[in-house]
A protein has these predicted regions:
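Conserved ABC transporter NBD signature motif
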Residues: 84-92
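The conserved cystathionine-beta-synthase
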Residues: 287-310, 314-318, 331-334, 351-398
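Conserved ABC ATPase "signature" C-loop
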Residues: 241-242
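A short, proline-enriched helix->beta-strand linker immediately N-terminal to the Walker B motif
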Residues: 181-185
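Conserved ABC ATPase signature
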Residues: 162-166, 170
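Conserved ABC ATPase "signature" region
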Residues: 19, 24-34, 91-92, 129, ...
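ABC ATPase "signature
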Residues: 247-248, 256, 324, 385
């Protein structure tokens, strides 16, 4: 079994008559469309398996009807699974008796919906405290805790206002505060920010990320906004037709999309904001070592010409970057009869970039630099190079 705070194994949900027959037909290779046409059964979720780590924000994405909202409701059993298992902290939620399931939801789970679902007759404080009221906490205890979480989301001064007196973003903050009030270890958020305008949505993303830094919780976040997923997600799971097509970090999926469906999700993404120098580096620039004696200019010139390369990098015996030199400059030295060694005074100094430098910052450096730029690892050693050609190819998705 996979490890994690939440582990989903071979999960299915079939709506309609004879659900087990529909699962058997899926395993035989029938499409969900054929099963619907010939058996009248709708496949909501099909053989989904994945895990979510403790303290992770795991984002589920997919087109409308791909099964995202059904899947998260199978995890907390608002919808009963047809087959499969859901483990939370090692406990199989799919097999729990109703009383234990209710206790688990009250103690350990919260959910935030796209519609704020605030009670209009209750003030902000009472809305935030509602989960604690259901859990049987005293008025004093729940109001104290509700004020704490309202403070966290920046709404303490609005505690005695009513929902109609708040903006949409503020109402969603109340919904988030209500989810946090019971101090759950996991939160399920179903397109929680999608009804907000772009500025308010980003503001709520900032609130969530800030709260996560202060008190890390396990969060499953459903979104249709790829920029949102890239910004807040530790990992992203992409669904299509009830199946989980790919799971990975934003960088992993950008670099290695599973298929065209996944690739199309990222067509509008500015990759330079999410990739780093380390992910773009290559060994495309010939490397020569200054090991107490500088490389010979004629030898370097001949090798560059043979490789059809225009630049060379020089490193010392410990792989520290020493400098760069162009084929044009070396050729002039050689043609002038000066087949001397490439000592430091002949090299061009270029400040290397660290592997974790975001690509948008790398682009700025490439624009002002004539040739490729060197990349160094965490220990300061040379680890590769980035050229303009390499950058353009990567941004084109090649």
């Amino acid at each position: 079994m996979q490890s994690g705070k939440i582990v989903v194994q071979n999960l299915y949900k079939v709506f309609g008559q004879q659900p087990q027959e529909a699962i058997d037909l899926l395993k035989q290779g029938w499409s969900k469309e054929k099963i619907l046409a010939e058996r009248g059964a709708v496949i909501g979720v099909s053989d989904v398996s994945f895990s979510v780590n403790e303290g992770e924000i795991f984002v589920l994405m997919g087109l409308s009807g791909s099964g995202k909202s059904t899947l998260i409701r199978l995890i907390n059993r608002l919808i009963e699974p047809t087959a499969g298992d859901v483990f939370i902290d090692g406990q199989n939620v799919a097999k729990l008796p109703k009383s234990q399931l209710i206790d688990l939801r009250r103690r350990d789970m919260s959910m935030v919906f796209q519609s704020f679902a605030l009670m209009p007759s209750r003030c902000v404080l009472d809305n935030a405290a509602f989960g604690l009221e259901v859990a049987g906490k005293s008025k004093k205890e729940r109001e104290k805790r509700a004020m704490e979480v309202l403070e966290q989301v920046g709404l303490a001064s609005f505690a005695h206002k009513y929902p109609h007196e708040l903006s949409g973003g503020m109402q969603q903050r109340v919904g988030l505060a209500r989810a946090l009030a019971v101090d759950p270890s996991m939160i399920i958020m179903d397109e929680a920010f999608s009804a907000l305008d772009p500025l308010k949505r980003r503001e709520m993303q900032d609130v969530l990320l800030d709260l996560q830094k202060k008190h890390s919780r396990t969060i499953i976040f459903v979104s249709h906004d790829i920029e949102e997923a890239m910004r807040i997600g530790s990992r992203i799971g992409i669904m299509e037709g009830g199946k989980l097509i790919q799971v990975g970090t934003p960088q992993e999926i950008i670099e290695n999309p599973a298929n065209d469906y996944v690739r199309n999700f990222f067509n509008t993404v500015d990759c330079s904001r999410y990739l780093t120098a380390g992910q773009l580096k290559s060994d495309s620039v010939p490397l020569f070592v200054h090991n107490g004696k500088a490389p010979d200019a004629q030898m370097v010139c001949q090798k560059l010409q043979a490789l059809d390369k225009h630049y060379a990098f020089i490193v010392d015996e410990k792989n520290n970057f020493r400098g760069s030199i162009s084929l044009e400059k070396i050729a002039l030295l050689v043609e002038g009869g000066r087949t001397l060694d490439l000592e430091q005074n002949l090299l061009k100094h270029i400040d290397p970039v660290p592997e974790d430098l975001p690509l948008d910052s790398v682009i700025q450096r490439l624009v002002i630099n004539e040739g490729p730029i060197p990349v160094i690892d965490q220990s300061g050693r040379y680890s590769g190079a980035i050229s303009k050609g390499r950058l353009l190819s990567r941004l084109r998705g090649e």
